[in-house]
Design a protein with these regions (language model features):
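Residue-level signal for short hydrophobic patches within transmembrane helices
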Residues: 16, 20-39, 43, 66-73, ...
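Short runs within selected transmembrane alpha-helices of multi-pass transporters and secretion channels
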Residues: 78, 147-165, 173-181, 202-215, ...
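Hydrophobic alpha-helical transmembrane segments in multi-pass membrane proteins
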Residues: 26, 30-38, 75, 107-116, ...
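Small-residue-rich hydrophobic transmembrane alpha-helices
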Residues: 57-117, 154-173, 280-338, 342-344, ...
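Helix-terminus/linker motif at the lipid-water interface of multi-pass membrane proteins
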Residues: 35, 39-58, 127-134, 190-197, ...
Length: 460
């Protein structure tokens, strides 16, 4: 089959031409998009930290890991939609592509409503299980309940953007997020400073921004004249495609959810040091998040490029995609990670002027930013395998290497040498162990996946 031709200037041909140049063209808008999504929460934190006090700062920041646990399963499933859509698009299978798009968007609506209900009814209980201090739990609960009311918009944007990424379009989702980000920032200032709504104000601003980005991405799909055109009358669940989406997406979502559960345990350990350490972790974790968004863009590129080339049987190009992604991810992580630590005090002052909070934040940054290139390596090998449709074994190994190591560390080593330093050394240790497991897995699975591709190539 012949791949579907590009329909507009926003799409990228992933199956021909220079790989590195196209990876950069694909990754940069996606990187900025990820940073802007984090900026929604960062602006919330900056505004409440500056204008509502340290308790409000701790309240908003302490919800991050818990929100990720609730949402990452469904966001992971969107990766399955991305992989399947990329494969069908590259192979020129327009009917299958269209049905995949409508199945994915329908599932996004359903999952968004489910998450809104979960957040509304279970937020406080989950925060209590985390040991959230009494002086911030009411504010944390209020923030989470309002935030989760926007889950349908959040899910629709992410699934719509996953479809656009599948065809190489990362520029328009970036434009949509810029618009939403400006709205978010303006509403934060208005609702918190002018109307004194505190954490409720920043949550309302975030939900409004999510609604705007959702409308824009759906409009983009609706206006398309390609096989990924959206028609609301065609929304349905096709079991065959939902099953294939789940095959890749559910393991990815479970992996992300379980890893974030380990971060919830880590948040609980930080909570035991009091509100100063909580605020320091909140600020440092936001900087840490920007680094992850940057290298995760390369992982997303690896998955999309691999999936399209798998769809047309170009196994040699799949290998080159992984190598170029490793080079690009390492370069980005070393530059941004080193910069984040060198300018750490200045970056932390964006969130707070409290010297004790900044000191805690710097201690955390030392063990998470300088070694962050390891996190990129850890994600790229399973990202490549997911592009080939193989997701279960990488998920199991990631859970064993990352979560298993951190649980042993938190409950075994940390109580004996109780300090923030010892707590956060668990990050690079878990990354190294997981890399070793994932490389071994990649070598074996690659042989199995490539065998029929090589036979098909030899027969031509």
């Amino acid at each position: 089959m012949h791949s579907e031709k590009k329909k507009n200037r926003f799409e990228i041909d992933m199956c021909n031409g220079s790989i590195m140049n196209k990876l950069i063209s694909f990754s940069i808008p996606l990187m900025i998009s990820g940073i802007l999504q984090l900026a929604f929460n960062a602006v919330d934190i900056v505004v409440v930290g500056r204008f509502s006090g340290s308790e409000s700062l701790a309240a908003v920041g302490s919800t991050t890991a818990l929100i990720n646990v609730f949402t990452n399963l469904f966001i992971g499933i969107s990766l399955g939609a991305n992989v399947l859509a990329a494969r069908f698009y590259a192979a020129g299978r327009e009917k299958e592509m269209s049905e995949t798009v409508h199945t994915a968007i329908t599932f996004a609506i359903i999952s968004g409503v489910v998450m809104a209900l979960v957040g509304l009814f279970f937020s406080r209980g989950a925060l209590e299980l985390m040991g959230t201090p009494d002086n911030v739990i009411n504010l944390s609960t209020l923030y989470m309940k309002i935030y989760f009311l926007g889950m349908p918009f959040f899910m629709l944007y992410n699934y719509g953007a996953a479809i656009l990424r599948a065809v190489g379009d990362t520029k328009r989702p970036l434009l949509f997020l810029i618009v939403a980000g400006v709205i978010n920032a303006c509403l934060n200032l208005l609702l918190v400073i002018a109307f004194h709504l505190g954490v409720a104000g920043v949550a309302i601003a975030t939900v409004t921004a999510q609604f705007v980005s959702c409308v824009l991405v759906l409009r983009c799909l609706y206006k398309s004249d390609s096989s990924y055109q959206l028609r609301f009358s065609k929304l349905m669940i096709k079991k065959v495609y939902l099953g294939q989406i789940f095959q890749v997406g559910i393991p990815a979502g479970i992996q992300s959810t379980v890893i974030n559960f380990s971060n919830v345990l880590l948040q609980s350990s930080v909570n035991s040091f009091g509100s100063v350490a909580m605020a320091g972790y909140t600020a440092a974790n936001n900087i840490f998040g920007f680094l992850y968004a940057s290298i995760n863009a390369v992982t997303q590129a690896c998955m999309s490029f691999t999936s399209q080339n798998y769809g047309v049987g170009k196994w040699k190009r799949m290998d080159r995609v992984l190598v170029d992604c490793l080079i690009l991810s390492t370069t980005i992580a070393l530059i941004l990670g080193g910069g984040a630590y060198l300018f750490g005090p200045e970056l932390l002052k964006i969130y707070t002027d409290d010297s004790q909070v900044i000191s805690c934040g710097m201690e955390i940054l030392l063990y998470t930013t300088v070694t962050y290139f390891l996190c990129g390596w850890m994600d790229l090998f399973p990202g490549s395998l997911r592009g080939m449709g193989k997701s279960i074994v990488p998920m199991i190994l990631s859970v064993i290497g990352t979560v298993g190591t951190r649980i042993v560390w938190i409950f075994g080593i940390f109580p004996r040498f109780r300090s923030l330093k010892i707590l956060f050394i668990s990050y690079p240790v878990s990354w190294i162990i997981t890399i070793i497991l994932q490389v071994i897995c990649f070598i074996f699975v690659r042989r199995i996946v490539y065998a029929p591709l090589k036979k098909r190539e030899a027969a031509v």
